[in-house]
Amino acid sequence: MFLLATAFLITQLPNTPPNVPVPQEILRPQEMRVLPGALDQIPVFNSNSPELVLNEGILLSTFPKAQKSFANAHLDRSFTGRFDLFTHHIAKGGTEDLRTLYEGVIVYNPTAEPVTIDILQAASYVSQPDAPFIEMPSVVENPIGNVYAGPGSRSVSDVLRGRRQDVFPASITIAPQQYGMLLNLPIPVKTLIPPVNGRSTLMRVRSSGRVYVASLALFAKMDVRGQERAPTLAEWQDVVQTGQLSTPRDKTPTPIEQTAGSLVYGRVAGVATGSRWQAQVTDLGKRTLATPPIGGAFSYGISLLNRGTLGTKQNQSAKMEVRYPDTAYQAHGNYGIE
């Protein structure tokens, strides 16, 4: 694994107390190399905006716009064969509203034949209690996948190890012109102080036919005993047909062509191209990679951005096939990408 590094390492302690020697500034120059290789062409359903979900509605829908109450909430992009799904959203309760927010990922088969979706690897965790954010050493061994900080960290670790979490079946089959659920899980906040929780999900799947996918948000419903229950398939279907984009929205991104001034990358909601970056790292013009001399160093950037190339002029962000106008222009950070 390569670590993201800057071309210069600077160590300095500001605002030193009186009578304490001013720390020495140490500059260690090093080479910043372009990472060879490229992303593959596997599409990624990437649902991360709005990150903080305060209201019910559509988070990301690739369904057709036709016959929907809010056409602008749908991106009209089907999937077939291999594709990935990445979602990350946060729920936050209020002083008088601690209802459990559910995230649902619904799939529709528009064809005249049954479609089977094989769930190759998949994991979904909440930050509390599954994977809290904790302080960790800069480097730590993780041979069996029990070291993580945050739900995204744990989900990615499982998928890279070829695991499929127990909450996911090996496959689902969807009848012609019918719906199915890939995910219907809570983001509980009721017992937390403060009442904030997040869920990260990463799935690698293969579909035998064409399908549409949507990531949705609904609060738990009440059963006849007054207890919370998960939304039903029919209730999720209704969100697809009549729901609008969940609000409030995240910050609108800075236009991608803007190269100066303040910068907002924005959060991703759409379909990106590229699930895996494969590279053979060698010295320029050679077939091998030599270690630097004693005292020397070189680095490769990981997840470099259009305005954060660290001097390499290389933008590694996955391109968006479809997106909402108020969300990120590219999949900045390449979340969930191997």
Model regions and ranges:
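Helix-biased "structured C-terminal domain" signature
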Residues: 232-338
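Beta-strand-rich interaction surfaces with strong enrichment in secreted/lumenal proteins
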Residues: 74-75, 169-172, 326
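Solvent-exposed, conformationally flexible loop/turn segments
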Residues: 80, 98, 167-180, 274, ...
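N-terminal, Lys/Arg-enriched amphipathic/low-complexity engagement segments
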Residues: 22-82
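Terminal connector regions
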Residues: 188-232
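Asparagine-centered strand-capping/turn motif at beta-strand->loop junctions
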Residues: 89-95, 99-101, 106-115, 121-125, ...
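Intrinsically disordered, low-complexity Pro/Gly/Ser/Thr-rich segments with frequent PxxP/GP/PP motifs
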Residues: 134-191, 338
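Short, solvent-exposed beta-strand/turn "edge" segments of beta-rich domains on protein surfaces
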Residues: 78-80, 88-100, 104-106, 192-194, ...
